[in-house]
Structure formats: C-alpha cells, structure tokens
C-alpha cells in the first residue's frame, strides 16, 4: 500500500483514521453510504456478501471499496458482530458545504460483540457481556498455573451492570460458562493461557496494572476509597476491572455515566455447576440444534425482555442462600394471594426495555422514539408501583422504593417531545411546538409563514450570527416561500 503522503486528501484522512484502529473494520461515512476500504473492503465483501468495487486511484493504485447505504447500516452491523467482528463507526461531523478539503470525520464509537447497546443489535432475551481476565503472576508450569489467582470483571454495557469475581486457573472454564461473555479482553502476554469460544481482544500488558485499575475504578464509581467494595489488596481483581473499564470507555468515546456500582460475586454464593453440567442440563442452550427445548424456554413467561434476561441469569446462578430464596418465594406468594399477578403482568407488557433506554441516555445515544417510549411508560410504572405497595413483603417494599422516580421527569419529557417524534432529527421533527421559541420561528420560516416584521427580525438575528456589519441579509416572500439574500452593504 502506498504511503499516506502519496494519496489523495480523502484517502490520507481515511488512512490516518484507520491507523488508529488497525485491528477492527472501519466503517467510513461518505455521503449516504458507509464505505470499507482496501483490506477491510475485501474482508467485508466476503462476510456481508456485498459487491467489491474500486473507486478511482490513489497513490498510484486502484482503491478497493465496498459499501452499504446508511439506511441499512444496522442490519449489516448486526451480521458483522454476530460473526465476531468489531467495527469502528466513522461519521461526518463537518459541514460538506463549508469544507474546503475533505469533510471532517471522527470515530464516534466502536461496535464490538461485548459492548452493544443498540436494541437492533442485541438479543431481546439475553445480555451481551464484556469480560476482562487478569492472571496474577507470569505463566509457569501447568500445575502451579492452576492454583494462581485469576481476576474476572465483566460489564453488561446495555444495563450498566458491573461485576467481578476471583477464581483459580483450573476453575476459569466453569466461571466463563456461568458468565457467558460475548467478548473477552486479555493482556497480550497472557493470550496463550486462555482458551475461549468468545471473541478475544488483546491489549498491552500495562492495561492490566493493578494500581491503574484501582484509580480507574475509583474514578468510575466516584469514591475516594474502594474499601466498601471488597477489592483492596486483590491485585487480580483490580487489574481486570481497570482493563475492562478502559476498553469499554474507548469503544464508546464517552463516560460510562450509568456504571455506578460494583458487585463482587463469590463462588460460594451459588451452586457450583461446571460447563459440562450446564450444557447437559440444557438450561439455556439445547444439546442438539439451536431450536431445541431448554429449561429457559419452558419457564419463560416474562412480559418483558428485562424479565427474561433476569430469569436467564437466575437459571445460571442457583442460590445457596436459603434466606434470599425465601424472600423471592414470599413475594410470589403475596402476588398470588392478592390476585395481582395478572394485573402486573398486563401492565408490564406495555413497558419498553427501560434498562437499555437508560443506558443509551447515559451514553448520549438514545433515539427520540426511545425517549418517547420512556415518557409513555412512566405513568404505567407509577401504577405498577402503587400495586406493589399493597404487598406486605420485604423484597416488594425494596422494589417500591427502587421504582421511585423524579416527580418532574414525565412532565419534562411530555413538554419537550412531539407525541410521535421522528426516528432521528435528520428524518423529521422531534421537539414539541412551544418548547423553544427560536425553533418555532425557524419552523415557521421553513413552512413559508413569515411576513415583513418577521423578516426584519430574522435579518437582525442573522447579522448577529455573521458578526459583521458589512453584510446585508434580506428576506423576501415569493410564492409562499422565503428566500434569504446575502450581499455587501452599500455605502450611504
């Protein structure tokens, strides 16, 4: 491949960005298409069964290209992620009309199998977890390696659920079968010590530094000390947590504002099941074929995807604590005795996936229709909360407290959003009339509803925006449409 300096300006920009993400496919926005280039194009063409073409030449060679329309990008992303690929999404962030050279572009996020948050890319009834594995000490002989401490941290980015556990090398396969991560991060120097079915990403060994991990964890949780979380003095756990958080933050190009706590799991909390036992019990995966019966399919009558995912988690984590199991039984008994189960189930059927919407809000990637779904769900949640308040069980009371929401949240969303907003601001209107006077004026201008007084006001506004007194902005209404004319001020 020619060196970047020999390429056209657009391809120089592409190669600079690609050099920052050498190990993932680069989805490069060009107008109404996302394009792959060079080796990425050849690989994507095979994986997606799309046409491999060439677009002109750069650096003295033809440029291999393969692209998909922006409107169908989600379905192609889903296929790539299902195949274990990671994709960097490079968007146009500059204005093409104002750009003298290539339009400014930036990678806004990296989509990987373990960091999915888009509803269209996620299974409704299963979580996608990202795990990081830290080995305490260098590789030695196999007998000693089996007794070494291994730290595992995992994060479900679509809900903000961060957990960690400490095990030994010989117990690692059983723990991975329990956690079932969609992607694993491991140090480059430890890659040969890990045999896993999930896609594995390697990072430099220093990403697994325990002191760095402690600092990243304190910053993420907003605390001065980690004493309350039970990780101090456990270097393998701290190393795994630090590498996990660093990788997740890098993929999102955003703070993980919804990740606010850490739960440490102990092998003594649950009934121990090795990988073979889990498979033979057919808890969630059938022995023969993808469509075979499983215990999960038999039991799953949940009204929401959130409930189905919780049930799946419980099946893989059978409790040893009789008190915790009894608390669940008490709530179920109270629901049945009060005859509330059908009413609550019906109410839940109209509740969207709040876990995933909340995560996307925190990551600043929520779509308008998701916010509208949240707005419409809030009154239903309050009705469910009142129904649960009638149940006299400790676990039910804790649920009632957890469901308390800010009083003005629904009013704010109702006042801000249209009843049926567009899928995205590019597709149409999102904000309700009356929320922002300036936006209302611009909509009136777009619709051609502007008169002489409005034209004068628009002229003054535009002069302030331009910041020059030698520019004249004039508005004229012609055939129901408004035209803005910009020209030099004449000397008086």
What are these regions (language model features)?
Residues 322-323, 382, 469-471, 477, ...:
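A short hydrophobic/aromatic micro-motif that marks alpha-helical segments and, especially, helix-coil
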């Amino acid at each position: 491949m020619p060196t970047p300096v020999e390429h056209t300006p657009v391809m120089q920009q592409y190669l600079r960005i690609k050099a920052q993400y050498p190990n993932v496919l680069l989805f490069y926005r060009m107008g109404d298409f996302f394009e792959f280039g060079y080796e990425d194009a050849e690989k994507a063409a095979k994986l997606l069964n799309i046409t491999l073409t060439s677009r002109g030449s750069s650096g003295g060679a033809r440029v291999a290209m393969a692209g998909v329309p922006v409107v169908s990008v989600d379905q192609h992303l889903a296929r790539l992620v299902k195949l274990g690929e990671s994709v960097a999404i490079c968007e146009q962030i500059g204005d093409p009309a104002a750009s003298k050279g290539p339009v400014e572009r930036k990678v806004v996020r990296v989509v990987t199998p373990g960091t999915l948050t888009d509803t269209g890319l996620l299974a409704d009834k299963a979580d996608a977890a990202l795990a990081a594995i830290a080995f305490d000490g260098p590789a030695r002989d196999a007998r000693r390696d089996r007794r070494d401490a291994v730290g595992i941290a995992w994060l479900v980015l679509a809900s903000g659920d961060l957990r960690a556990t400490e095990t030994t090398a010989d117990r690692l396969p059983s723990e991975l079968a329990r956690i079932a991560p969609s992607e694993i991060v491991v140090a480059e120097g430890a890659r040969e010590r890990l045999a896993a079915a999930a896609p594995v990403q390697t990072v430099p060994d220093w990403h697994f530094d325990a002191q760095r991990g402690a600092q990243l964890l304190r910053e993420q949780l907003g605390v001065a000390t980690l004493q309350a979380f039970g990780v101090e003095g456990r270097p393998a756990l701290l190393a795994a947590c630090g590498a996990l958080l660093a990788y997740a933050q890098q993929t999102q190009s955003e703070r993980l504002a919804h990740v606010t706590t850490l739960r440490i799991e102990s092998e003594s909390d649950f009934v121990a099941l090795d990988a073979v036992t889990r498979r033979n019990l057919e808890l969630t995966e059938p022995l023969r074929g993808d469509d075979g019966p499983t215990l999960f399919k038999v039991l799953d009558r949940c009204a929401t995807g959130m409930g189905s995912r919780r049930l799946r988690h419980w099946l893989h984590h059978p409790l040893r604590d009789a008190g915790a199991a009894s608390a669940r039984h008490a709530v179920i008994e109270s629901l049945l005795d009060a005859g509330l189960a059908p009413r609550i189930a019906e109410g839940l059927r109209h509740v969207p996936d709040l876990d995933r919407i909340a995560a996307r809000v925190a990551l600043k990637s929520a779509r308008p229709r998701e916010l509208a779904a949240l707005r419409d769900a809030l009154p239903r949640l309050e009705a469910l909360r009142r129904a649960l308040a009638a149940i006299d069980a400790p676990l039910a009371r804790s649920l009632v407290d957890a469901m308390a929401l800010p009083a003005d949240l629904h009013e704010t969303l109702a006042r801000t959003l249209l009843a049926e907003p567009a899928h995205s601001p590019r597709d149409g209107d999102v904000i309700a009339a009356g929320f922002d006077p300036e936006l209302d004026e611009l909509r009136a201008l777009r619709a051609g509803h502007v008169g002489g007084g409005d034209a004068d006001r628009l002229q003054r506004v535009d002069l302030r925006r331009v910041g020059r007194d030698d520019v004249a902005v004039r508005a004229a209404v012609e055939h129901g449409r408004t035209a803005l004319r910009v020209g030099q001020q004449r000397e008086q």
